[in-house]
């Protein structure tokens, strides 16, 4: 669709709502129309298909807060006579007493208005037309990159490395500053001022009664040109090579998290700043520890006697093992907290959560078996019944 045709649309009427309708009413109206006229519900019905498309187009504009505001501003401008003669040839009046008396086609304000940049008429028309219709400059007139490209890479860490933090070498292949010209692109090391824009980076163009500015096509908006290109980089200021950098991974990084290193991406052209490096971290599973937030969980096998009689057990941590005291009668599956032994970040420190789990010996020595039989008799005499309060007794 031609951009100028968009301005002649009545999107509110297409949705069957008033211009003052709330966002919720607009959404409800669109959903109702979309449901009633959906192609799947009306196979072969061209009228329903057209209604469906019109509703979708309308909702795309007035269903978006920013686009709706720009659309409303444009319609108000047209209704007030701010642009007369419609979107064909003829004169045009603009707010602020500014008038075009020459043969002016208002459609020039849209896609064919000339290269991007600021529209000089009062009233913010550049914002209105440029925003809703996405008018922009052509590729050949757009400014050159002002920084290097961002780079992404992946690394894999052990569980402890991610929890405690580490440094790791990373090898990257991409654009790096040319060593011969030190990134300037010029053999002399000093680019020259662009003669076409006089170093400003922009040129002006008059279209009828209106003035437009655009990035200079000679220097790409930089204000500088290379008159003596470096033989090694051919004036780009960068060459492709492999480099190795050391990446510091902060403590507490999680699986899938990205670490940003500013200025460590690809070098910018002709001395422009480098892009950023984003390192995506993958964390291996650990056979002992599991992480939940900043807390670390570990399950420790224990014997029945250790739980029944109490005592101290050795528990692994991210650093070195610690002793954990068990009270007599600690139940199987109990989770105990060791404070401050979890993952430590810049803002918080987690705990170590220790779950004790009874392990039954697969075989017993004669001495151990006799001791257990003696214990079993004593247990009965003491009146202990592990199923005394069990709900299953009533089934």
From Swiss-Prot:
Q: Where are the CXXCXGXG motif repeats?
A: 178-185, 194-201, 216-223, 230-237
Q: Name any cofactors this protein relies on.
A: Zn(2+)
Listed InterPro entries: DnaJ (IPR012724), DnaJ_C (IPR002939), DnaJ_domain (IPR001623), HSP40/DnaJ_pept-bd (IPR008971), HSP_DnaJ_Cys-rich_dom (IPR001305), HSP_DnaJ_Cys-rich_dom_sf (IPR036410), J_dom_sf (IPR036869)
Please name the SMART domains in this protein's record.
DnaJ
Cellular component per GO, a single term: cytoplasm
Question: Which residues does the UniProt record annotate as the domain J?
Answer: 10-75
Residues that hold Zn(2+) 2 according to the record: 194, 197, 216, 219
GO terms under biological process:
chaperone cofactor-dependent protein refolding; DNA replication; protein refolding; response to heat
Binding sites annotated in the UniProt record for Zn(2+) 1: 178, 181, 230, 233
The organism sits in which domain of life? Answer: Bacteria
How many cofactors are bound and how? Binds 2 Zn(2+) ions per monomer.
Which Gene Ontology molecular-function terms are recorded?
A: ATP binding; heat shock protein binding; unfolded protein binding; zinc ion binding
Q: Where in the cell is it found?
A: Cytoplasm
Alphabetized, the UniProt keywords read:
Chaperone, Cytoplasm, DNA replication, Metal-binding, Repeat, Stress response, Zinc, Zinc-finger
Question: By its UniProt entry, which Gene3D superfamilies does this protein fall under?
Answer: DnaJ domain, Heat shock protein DnaJ, cysteine-rich domain, Urease metallochaperone UreE, N-terminal domain
Q: Where are the zinc fingers (CR-type)?
A: 165-242
| Role | Participates actively in the response to hyperosmotic and heat shock by preventing the aggregation of stress-denatured proteins and by disaggregating proteins, also in an autonomous, DnaK-independent fashion. Unfolded proteins bind initially to DnaJ; upon interaction with the DnaJ-bound protein, DnaK hydrolyzes its bound ATP, resulting in the formation of a stable complex. GrpE releases ADP from DnaK; ATP binding to DnaK triggers the release of the substrate protein, thus completing the reaction cycle.
- Entry's family note: Belongs to the DnaJ family.
Description of its domains = The J domain is necessary and sufficient to stimulate DnaK ATPase activity. Zinc center 1 plays an important role in the autonomous, DnaK-independent chaperone activity of DnaJ. Zinc center 2 is essential for interaction with DnaK and for DnaJ activity.
* SUBUNIT field: Homodimer.
State what protein this is by name: Chaperone protein DnaJ 2
Which organism was this protein described from?
Answer: Corynebacterium efficiens (strain DSM 44549 / YS-314 / AJ 12310 / JCM 11189 / NBRC 100395)
């Amino acid at each position: 669709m031609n951009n100028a045709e968009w301005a002649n649309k009545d999107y509110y009427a297409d949705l069957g709502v008033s211009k003052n309708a709330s966002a919720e009413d607009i959404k409800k109206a669109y959903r109702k129309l979309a449901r009633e006229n959906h192609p799947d519900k009306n196979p072969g019905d061209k009228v329903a298909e057209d209604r469906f498309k019109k509703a979708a187009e309308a909702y795309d504009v007035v269903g978006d807060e920013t686009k709706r505001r720009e659309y409303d501003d444009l319609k108000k401008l047209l209704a007030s006579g701010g642009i007369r003669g419609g979107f064909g040839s003829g004169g045009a009046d603009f707010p602020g007493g500014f008038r075009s008396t020459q043969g002016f086609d208002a459609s020039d304000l849209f896609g064919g208005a000339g290269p991007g940049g600021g529209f000089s008429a009062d009233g913010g028309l550049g914002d209105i037309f440029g925003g809703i219709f996405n008018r922009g400059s052509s590729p050949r007139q757009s400014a050159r990159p002002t920084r290097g490209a961002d780079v992404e890479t992946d690394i894999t860490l052990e569980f402890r490395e991610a929890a405690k933090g580490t440094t790791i070498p990373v090898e990257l292949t991409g654009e790096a500053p040319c060593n011969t010209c030190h990134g300037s692109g010029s053999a002399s090391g000093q680019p020259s001022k662009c003669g076409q824009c006089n170093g400003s980076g922009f040129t002006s163009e008059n279209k009828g009664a209106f003035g437009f500015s655009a990035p200079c096509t000679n220097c790409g908006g930089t204000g500088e040109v290379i008159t003596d290109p470096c033989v090694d980089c051919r004036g780009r200021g960068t060459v492709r090579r492999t480099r190795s950098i050391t990446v510091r991974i902060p403590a507490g990084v999680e699986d899938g998290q990205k670490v940003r290193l500013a200025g460590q991406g690809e070098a910018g052209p002709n001395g422009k700043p480098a892009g950023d490096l984003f390192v995506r971290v993958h964390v291996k599973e650990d056979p002992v520890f599991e992480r939940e937030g900043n807390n670390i969980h570990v399950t420790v096998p224990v014997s029945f006697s250790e739980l029944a009689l109490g005592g101290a057990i050795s528990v692994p941590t991210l650093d070195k093992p610690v002793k954990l005291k068990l009270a007599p009668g600690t139940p199987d599956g109990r989770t105990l907290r060791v404070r401050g032994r979890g993952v430590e970040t810049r803002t918080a420190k987690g705990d170590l959560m220790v779950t004790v789990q009874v392990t039954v010996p697969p075989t017993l020595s004669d001495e151990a078996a006799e001791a257990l039989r003696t214990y079993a008799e004593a247990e009965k005499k003491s009146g202990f019944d592990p199923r005394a309060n069990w709900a299953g007794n009533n089934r």
